[in-house]
């Protein structure tokens, strides 16, 4: 992932080295995001030859990553272009950039490797200068790149747009693309024209845009010579109050480092400071004792520096991206802090989207597009990119503040939450990249679909499901719980019927059988990676205890509600997020047998009512606590391979989960059949509910047996409604192709054959199998 472009002192410019690199290097080497479409020219793909008769010409202002990428994209569509670069070098050294493919995002996490397995592209680290050289070298026509062109102003009318340079030269085209960075002349000129021609609504948005540029943080970044203890391929982050560091060990042994610090105050627009040469020395003196990794201090990194620069980190979101024939891209329109490393990736996406949109304005008859067509195309570009880009800007800026411990909440997150969520950065990074823009004229690269999180335009940041909508769909579950609460009555007292000892034991066994499906499923969900920090992950034991105390019919619908709202399929877009903890998965079958069959056998073999009652009250009533303790203790004696399996075998837990589901199904089916054979009707067994401990002298079957049956029907009705909601999710994202007729048939047939508990487990096990398969969304 690329850090945002930063200006550097002219003395740090390096000479143009376009022809000094080996020609075999591929542009794909520089891009970790699988959807990026700029690649080394492929002989199998013909690039349209641009001539003086091209339908459209784009004047690209700025030879930045955004500008050069846009040139590549336009060439694929046969759209003519010219690039005007202010500097005399296309590739000055203005900062370090991406990640090494063997890097570790934190010293104890292998998140970059996981990201590579998910996306199909490993994370690559290289200097921004190198990427610019590669982009330049592979341009079909380098004569279209003009350096030393400082743009002064622009003009546009219904026929063309004109760029006027400081040296008096003029360049006309159908579109002007502003890729000239944070201090964009094109953006300023565009705003000037909006102020003249805009509506009241446009002017209101313009006022907000004019105060959008701000800076609250600064960055001292540079390159240093190798230091013992900082290995090649490793990445180190450190956080402190008001300051954080990021350091990469490059493949050449050099260290690429960043020191992010909070300014004394937030400044806006023209008030943002511009540091001069020498300011970095005074600034770094305050942080010499800051640890960058283990016992290594920033002072040692600074002492070994090769080059360094000190800049203010601007932040900016804009409402206006285009006006008539003018549009901006890259840092000129969406500027973020570099901690998340998404600045250049965002610029590349904007370039691809702008080219896609402009291509839609091309006419079949070869004539030039009208101003209305150009305006519509650029508006489409804004519409498709604005939301996603601004969400990434917000995420990056927030991440900077978390690392700088800006607030108490940021301190808590950085110190206690993030360290316990080793893959949170991999999740954020993959979420940002998986749904990124694709250049429509090129086929999807095979690698983009080979990872465990295949590319999809329906996934990623900005494409999340609406939680309010999910809550509305799950609202009937809360209504069922409220109905049970309002209708809850004391132990029935009317027309008591004394039961035999065998009937009492049957009541106890049916109570155990009724809990097995919920205990099994809820426990599995609590160990699922994609459910991290959800109610299902944090409170499974509490829900099971409340079910024992208040009744499963009251508690289960509440659990179902929270689980459905907090566990959409987007949480499991990566196959490894379906994975459960391997150590837990291995011991769960034994836990089910011990916790459920143990008390059941003791109750069934009891010869005295008092003994059965004691077992029920103690060994069974507190089973959620025993189950949790059993799993937590035995986890330490079983080898946990989750960290490796999440990368190399995300279905490693599946065989163990199948055993657990099968055992639960067999136990529930056996209890169901035993109840059917031991009572005059199987309905009596089906309608048992989890009750408070039965009195040792007699068991009561009150006059409200019909109400109990209704409760059980509603309980499993809620359970199956919850299950069908999740199957609807699977069908919506395309993971399940089965018809609703088949889904309902399996649920009903398994329920009638072996009871509702079996039906519920069968459906959940089926869902497990579907989620374990990789799904590729067709283009």
Swiss-Prot record:
The chain crosses the membrane at residues 471-491, 504-524, 542-562, 587-607, 618-638, 665-685, 742-762. Signal peptide: none annotated. The keyword Oxidoreductase applies. Keywords: FAD, Flavoprotein, Membrane, Monooxygenase, Oxidoreductase, Transmembrane, Transmembrane helix, Virulence. Induction: Expression of the botcinic acid clusters genes BOA1-13 and BOA17 is coregulated by BCG1 during both in vitro and in planta growth. Pfam families: FAD_binding_3. Its EC number is 1.-.-.-. GO terms for molecular function: FAD binding; monooxygenase activity. It is a multi-pass membrane protein. This is FAD-dependent monooxygenase BOA8. The lineage of its organism: Eukaryota, Fungi, Dikarya, Ascomycota, Pezizomycotina. GO terms for cellular component: membrane. Belongs to the paxM FAD-dependent monooxygenase family. It is found in: Membrane. FAD binds at residues 85, 128, 331, 344. Pathway: Polyketide biosynthesis. Its cofactor is FAD. Gene3D superfamilies: FAD/NAD(P)-binding domain. The keyword Lipid biosynthesis does not apply. FAD-dependent monooxygenase; part of the gene cluster B that mediates the biosynthesis of botcinic acid and its botcinin derivatives, acetate-derived polyketides that contribute to virulence when combined with the sesquiterpene botrydial. Botcinic acid and its derivatives have been shown to induce chlorosis and necrosis during host plant infection, but also have antifungal activities. Two polyketide synthases, BOA6 and BOA9, are involved in the biosynthesis of botcinins. It is an enzyme of class 1 (oxidoreductase).
């Amino acid at each position: 992932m690329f850090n945002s472009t930063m200006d550097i002192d002219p003395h740090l410019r390096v000479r143009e080295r376009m022809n000094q690199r080996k020609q075999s290097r591929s542009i794909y080497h520089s891009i970790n995001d699988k959807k990026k479409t700029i690649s080394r020219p492929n002989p199998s793909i013909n690039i349209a030859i641009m001539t003086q008769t091209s339908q459209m010409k784009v004047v690209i202002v700025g030879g930045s990553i955004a500008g050069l990428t846009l040139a590549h994209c336009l060439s694929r569509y046969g759209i003519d272009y010219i690039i005007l670069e202010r500097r005399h070098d296309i590739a000055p050294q203005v900062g370090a950039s991406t990640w090494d493919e063997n890097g570790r995002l934190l010293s104890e996490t292998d998140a970059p490797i996981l990201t590579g397995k998910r996306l199909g592209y490993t994370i690559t680290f290289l200097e921004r200068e190198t990427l610019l050289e590669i982009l330049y070298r592979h341009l079909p026509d380098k004569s279209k790149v003009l350096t030393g062109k400082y743009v002064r102003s622009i003009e546009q009318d219904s026929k063309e747009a004109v760029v006027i340079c400081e040296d008096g030269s003029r360049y006309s085209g159908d579109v002007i693309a502003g890729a000239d960075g944070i201090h964009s002349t094109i953006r300023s000129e565009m705003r000037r024209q909006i102020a003249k021609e805009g509506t009241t609504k446009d002017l209101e948005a313009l006022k907000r845009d004019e105060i959008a540029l701000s800076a609250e943080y600064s960055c001292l970044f540079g390159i240093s010579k190798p230091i013992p203890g900082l290995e090649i391929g490793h990445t180190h982050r450190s956080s402190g109050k008001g300051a954080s560091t990021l350091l990469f060990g490059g493949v050449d042994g050099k260290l690429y480092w960043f020191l992010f610090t909070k300014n004394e105050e937030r400044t806006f627009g023209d008030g943002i400071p511009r540091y001069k040469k020498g300011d970095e020395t005074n600034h770094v003196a305050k942080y010499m004792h800051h640890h960058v990794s283990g016992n290594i201090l920033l002072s040692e990194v600074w002492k070994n520096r090769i080059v360094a620069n000190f800049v203010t980190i601007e932040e900016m979101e804009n409402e206006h991206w285009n006006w008539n024939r003018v549009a901006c891209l890259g840092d000129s329109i969406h500027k973020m802090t570099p901690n998340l490393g998404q600045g250049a990736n965002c610029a590349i996406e904007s370039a691809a989207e702008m080219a896609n949109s402009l291509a839609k304005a091309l006419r079949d008859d070869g004539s030039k597009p009208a101003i209305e067509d150009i305006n519509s195309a650029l508006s489409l570009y804004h519409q498709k990119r604005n939301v996603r880009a601004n969400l990434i800007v917000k995420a990056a800026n927030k991440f900077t503040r978390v690392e700088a411990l800006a607030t108490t909440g940021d301190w808590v997150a950085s110190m206690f939450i993030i360290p316990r969520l080793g893959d949170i950065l991999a999740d954020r990074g993959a979420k940002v990249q998986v749904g990124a823009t694709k250049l429509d004229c090129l086929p999807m690269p095979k690698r983009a679909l080979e990872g465990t999180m295949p590319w999809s335009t329906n996934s990623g940041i900005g494409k999340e499901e609406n939680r309010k909508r999910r809550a509305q769909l799950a609202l009937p579950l809360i209504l069922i719980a409220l109905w049970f609460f309002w209708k809850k009555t004391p132990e029935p007292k009317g027309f008591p019927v004394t039961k035999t000892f065998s009937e009492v034991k049957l009541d106890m066994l049916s109570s155990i059988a009724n809990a097995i499906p919920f205990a099994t499923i809820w426990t599995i969900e609590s160990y699922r990676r994609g459910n991290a920090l959800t109610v299902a992950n944090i409170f499974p034991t509490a829900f099971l205890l409340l079910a024992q105390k208040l009744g499963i019919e009251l508690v289960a619908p509440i659990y179902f509600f929270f689980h459905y709202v907090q566990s959409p399929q987007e949480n499991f877009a990566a196959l490894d997020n379906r994975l459960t903890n391997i150590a837990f998965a291995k011991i769960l079958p034994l836990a089910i047998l011990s916790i459920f069959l143990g008390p059941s056998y003791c109750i069934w073999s009891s010869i005295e009512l008092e003994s059965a009652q004691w077992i029920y009250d103690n060994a069974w009533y507190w089973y959620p606590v025993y189950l949790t303790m059993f799993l937590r203790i035995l986890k330490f004696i079983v080898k946990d391979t989750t960290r490796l399996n999440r990368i190399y075998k995300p279905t490693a837990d599946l065989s163990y989960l199948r055993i657990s589901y099968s055992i639960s199904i067999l136990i529930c089916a056996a209890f169901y059949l035993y109840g059917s054979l031991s009572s005059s009707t199987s309905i009596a067994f089906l309608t048992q509910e989890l009750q408070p401990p039965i009195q040792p002298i007699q068991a009561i079957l009150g006059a409200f047996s019909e109400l109990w049956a209704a409760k059980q029907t509603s309980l499993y009705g809620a359970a199956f409604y919850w299950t069908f909601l999740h199957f609807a999710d699977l069908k919506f994202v395309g993971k399940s192709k089965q018809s609703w007729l088949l889904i309902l048939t399996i649920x009903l047939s398994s329920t009638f054959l072996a009871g509702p508990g079996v039906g519920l487990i069968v459906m959940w096990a089926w869902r497990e199998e579907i989620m374990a398969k990789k799904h590729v969304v067709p283009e």
